[in-house]
Curated annotation (Swiss-Prot):
HAMAP family, sorted: UPF0227
Domain of life: Bacteria
Protein name: UPF0227 protein Ssed_2836
Similarity field: Belongs to the UPF0227 family.
Length: 179
Protein backbone atom coordinates (compact mmCIF):
# COMPACT_ATOMS: atom_id res chain seq x y z
CA UNK A 1 0.00 0.00 0.00
CA UNK A 2 1.15 3.50 -0.84
CA UNK A 3 -0.41 6.42 1.00
CA UNK A 4 -0.15 9.63 -1.02
CA UNK A 5 -0.19 13.12 0.54
CA UNK A 6 -0.73 16.01 -1.86
CA UNK A 7 1.05 19.33 -1.52
CA UNK A 8 -0.46 22.75 -0.85
CA UNK A 9 -2.30 22.68 -4.19
CA UNK A 10 -4.72 19.92 -3.18
CA UNK A 11 -6.89 20.24 -6.29
CA UNK A 12 -4.10 19.98 -8.86
CA UNK A 13 -4.83 17.36 -11.55
CA UNK A 14 -1.17 16.35 -11.17
CA UNK A 15 -2.04 14.56 -7.92
CA UNK A 16 -4.22 12.05 -9.75
CA UNK A 17 -1.51 11.54 -12.37
CA UNK A 18 1.16 10.88 -9.71
CA UNK A 19 -1.14 8.35 -8.04
CA UNK A 20 -1.60 6.59 -11.40
CA UNK A 21 2.17 6.46 -11.86
CA UNK A 22 2.63 5.02 -8.36
CA UNK A 23 0.27 2.16 -9.28
CA UNK A 24 3.14 0.69 -11.32
CA UNK A 25 4.73 -0.04 -7.92
CA UNK A 26 1.62 -1.05 -5.99
CA UNK A 27 -1.98 -1.26 -7.22
CA UNK A 28 -3.15 -0.08 -3.78
CA UNK A 29 -2.45 3.67 -3.83
CA UNK A 30 -4.62 5.73 -1.49
CA UNK A 31 -5.00 9.49 -1.35
CA UNK A 32 -4.99 10.87 2.17
CA UNK A 33 -6.37 14.37 1.81
CA UNK A 34 -6.15 17.22 4.30
CA UNK A 35 -7.11 20.90 4.37
CA UNK A 36 -3.59 22.42 4.07
CA UNK A 37 -4.94 25.51 5.86
CA UNK A 38 -5.11 24.46 9.52
CA UNK A 39 -1.88 22.71 10.59
CA UNK A 40 -2.95 21.50 14.06
CA UNK A 41 -6.20 20.10 12.70
CA UNK A 42 -4.34 18.60 9.72
CA UNK A 43 -1.87 16.81 11.97
CA UNK A 44 -4.58 15.17 14.07
CA UNK A 45 -6.61 14.29 10.98
CA UNK A 46 -3.59 12.78 9.21
CA UNK A 47 -2.54 10.76 12.26
CA UNK A 48 -6.04 9.31 12.58
CA UNK A 49 -6.55 8.70 8.87
CA UNK A 50 -3.15 7.07 8.28
CA UNK A 51 -3.65 4.87 11.34
CA UNK A 52 -7.07 3.82 9.99
CA UNK A 53 -5.65 3.08 6.53
CA UNK A 54 -2.85 0.97 8.03
CA UNK A 55 -5.36 -1.05 10.04
CA UNK A 56 -7.36 -1.74 6.87
CA UNK A 57 -4.35 -3.06 4.95
CA UNK A 58 -2.47 -6.32 5.15
CA UNK A 59 0.62 -4.88 3.39
CA UNK A 60 3.67 -5.66 5.49
CA UNK A 61 5.66 -2.83 3.85
CA UNK A 62 3.39 0.21 3.38
CA UNK A 63 4.96 3.57 2.61
CA UNK A 64 3.77 7.15 2.72
CA UNK A 65 4.73 9.54 -0.08
CA UNK A 66 4.34 13.30 -0.06
CA UNK A 67 5.19 16.16 -2.38
CA UNK A 68 6.04 19.65 -1.09
CA UNK A 69 3.89 20.34 1.96
CA UNK A 70 2.71 16.73 1.75
CA UNK A 71 6.33 15.63 2.23
CA UNK A 72 6.53 17.75 5.41
CA UNK A 73 3.64 15.68 6.75
CA UNK A 74 4.81 12.35 5.27
CA UNK A 75 8.07 12.57 7.23
CA UNK A 76 6.33 13.24 10.54
CA UNK A 77 3.27 11.03 10.12
CA UNK A 78 5.42 8.20 8.76
CA UNK A 79 7.70 8.45 11.80
CA UNK A 80 4.80 8.53 14.26
CA UNK A 81 3.15 5.53 12.57
CA UNK A 82 6.37 3.54 12.20
CA UNK A 83 6.34 3.42 8.39
CA UNK A 84 8.91 4.54 5.86
CA UNK A 85 8.36 7.64 3.78
CA UNK A 86 9.32 9.13 0.43
CA UNK A 87 9.77 12.89 0.55
CA UNK A 88 9.60 14.67 -2.81
CA UNK A 89 10.78 18.30 -2.73
CA UNK A 90 9.79 18.60 0.94
CA UNK A 91 8.75 21.94 2.38
CA UNK A 92 10.78 21.86 5.60
CA UNK A 93 9.83 25.32 6.87
CA UNK A 94 6.12 25.96 6.25
CA UNK A 95 6.01 28.25 9.31
CA UNK A 96 8.16 30.64 7.26
CA UNK A 97 7.10 30.16 3.65
CA UNK A 98 3.36 29.66 4.13
CA UNK A 99 2.84 33.09 5.71
CA UNK A 100 0.02 34.81 3.85
CA UNK A 101 -1.15 31.55 2.28
CA UNK A 102 -2.75 29.92 5.34
CA UNK A 103 -4.48 31.25 8.45
CA UNK A 104 -2.03 30.17 11.15
CA UNK A 105 1.42 29.27 9.79
CA UNK A 106 2.86 29.69 13.28
CA UNK A 107 1.13 26.43 14.20
CA UNK A 108 3.85 24.61 12.26
CA UNK A 109 6.46 25.97 14.69
CA UNK A 110 4.27 24.83 17.59
CA UNK A 111 3.96 21.36 16.04
CA UNK A 112 7.74 21.16 15.58
CA UNK A 113 8.23 22.11 19.23
CA UNK A 114 5.92 19.31 20.35
CA UNK A 115 7.36 16.65 18.06
CA UNK A 116 9.64 13.96 19.46
CA UNK A 117 12.99 15.62 20.08
CA UNK A 118 15.55 14.83 17.40
CA UNK A 119 13.04 12.62 15.59
CA UNK A 120 15.16 12.54 12.42
CA UNK A 121 17.93 10.77 14.30
CA UNK A 122 15.39 8.21 15.50
CA UNK A 123 14.01 7.93 11.96
CA UNK A 124 17.42 7.62 10.29
CA UNK A 125 17.37 5.60 7.07
CA UNK A 126 13.57 5.37 7.03
CA UNK A 127 12.98 8.01 4.37
CA UNK A 128 14.00 8.45 0.76
CA UNK A 129 14.32 12.08 -0.35
CA UNK A 130 13.92 13.03 -4.02
CA UNK A 131 14.95 16.60 -4.83
CA UNK A 132 14.63 18.59 -8.06
CA UNK A 133 17.51 20.75 -9.15
CA UNK A 134 14.92 22.83 -11.06
CA UNK A 135 12.60 23.35 -8.07
CA UNK A 136 11.35 26.93 -8.36
CA UNK A 137 9.88 26.96 -4.81
CA UNK A 138 12.39 25.30 -2.46
CA UNK A 139 16.10 25.81 -1.91
CA UNK A 140 16.79 22.11 -2.33
CA UNK A 141 20.51 22.47 -1.69
CA UNK A 142 19.57 23.60 1.82
CA UNK A 143 17.03 20.76 2.09
CA UNK A 144 19.76 18.30 1.11
CA UNK A 145 22.10 19.71 3.75
CA UNK A 146 19.39 19.42 6.42
CA UNK A 147 18.28 15.89 5.55
CA UNK A 148 21.39 14.30 4.03
CA UNK A 149 22.77 13.13 7.36
CA UNK A 150 19.59 11.15 8.05
CA UNK A 151 18.18 9.95 4.74
CA UNK A 152 19.26 8.90 1.26
CA UNK A 153 19.09 11.87 -1.15
CA UNK A 154 18.36 11.41 -4.87
CA UNK A 155 18.63 14.31 -7.27
CA UNK A 156 16.45 14.86 -10.33
CA UNK A 157 17.75 17.08 -13.13
CA UNK A 158 14.46 17.82 -14.92
CA UNK A 159 11.36 18.04 -12.75
CA UNK A 160 9.89 21.28 -11.31
CA UNK A 161 8.59 21.64 -7.74
CA UNK A 162 5.31 19.74 -8.21
CA UNK A 163 7.25 16.84 -9.78
CA UNK A 164 4.64 15.81 -12.39
CA UNK A 165 6.60 12.85 -13.79
CA UNK A 166 7.79 10.21 -11.33
CA UNK A 167 8.67 7.59 -13.98
CA UNK A 168 12.46 7.76 -13.71
CA UNK A 169 12.26 7.35 -9.92
CA UNK A 170 9.67 4.54 -9.75
CA UNK A 171 12.30 1.75 -9.68
CA UNK A 172 14.09 3.47 -6.80
CA UNK A 173 10.84 4.04 -4.89
CA UNK A 174 9.90 0.39 -5.49
CA UNK A 175 13.27 -0.84 -4.14
CA UNK A 176 12.89 1.42 -1.11
CA UNK A 177 9.37 0.10 -0.46
CA UNK A 178 10.54 -3.51 -0.64
CA UNK A 179 13.75 -3.04 1.37
Amino acid sequence: MILYLHGFDATSPGNHEKMRQLQFIDKDVRLVSYSTLHPKHDMQHLLNEVSRQLQQSDDSDPIIIGVGLGAYWAERIGFLNGIRSVLINPNLNPQENMVGRIDRPEEYADIAGKCVSEFRGKNQGKALVILSRKDQVNDNQSVSEQLGGFYQICWDEEQPHKFPVLASHLPQINLFKQA
